[in-house]
């Protein structure tokens, strides 16, 4: 089962103005992601997802080019089931032989940030292909189920000190969450403001 093609598409979904929010990363005006598509010579197609920036911010064009023209081209004609080996080679580039010979990773420069995001999208697509080829869900391939349910927390908490307590309590009361994560940091503009918001939340 050889890899025939690797492609990527930037998806941008505008967020209605009333549902936008501002974080440390800026105003969230759209949800951006890159859809990765890996096709094999057997006809199986796997899909993955990669992010161009933290908090869904960022232009997806560079990530699409990276996946399609650099990372993806390394994989054409290769065995789609050799997932760990492909990850190692994409991450370490021309230095992959060090990892194979010595048994440990040998990171090359420039293999973080955007590159690791691109690798992740391809990696997900390859796992998708493996699952399809075996007729198994990916969670089984990764070791199986550990529990029947998983606790979730609410993420948000952007309100100023005067309203943060009410906002966080709403997540618990209205959403049924047992825990919440509030945001503090550069969006506050001053660490004193962050401290006041945290104190008010308590």
Give the residues covered by each predicted segment.
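Metal-dependent enolase-superfamily TIM-barrel catalytic cores that perform enediolate-based chemistry
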Residues: 143, 148-202
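Conserved active-site and cofactor/substrate-binding residues in soluble primary-metabolism enzymes
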Residues: 30-31, 62, 66, 81, ...
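Metal- or metallocofactor-binding catalytic centers and their adjacent structured scaffolds
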Residues: 5, 39-133
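Structured beta-strand/loop patches that form or line metal/cofactor-binding pockets in enzymes
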Residues: 1-55
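A short, structure-level motif marking secondary-structure boundaries and short turns
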Residues: 22, 111-113, 152-154
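A short alpha-helix capping/helix-coil boundary motif
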Residues: 14, 104-108, 146-149
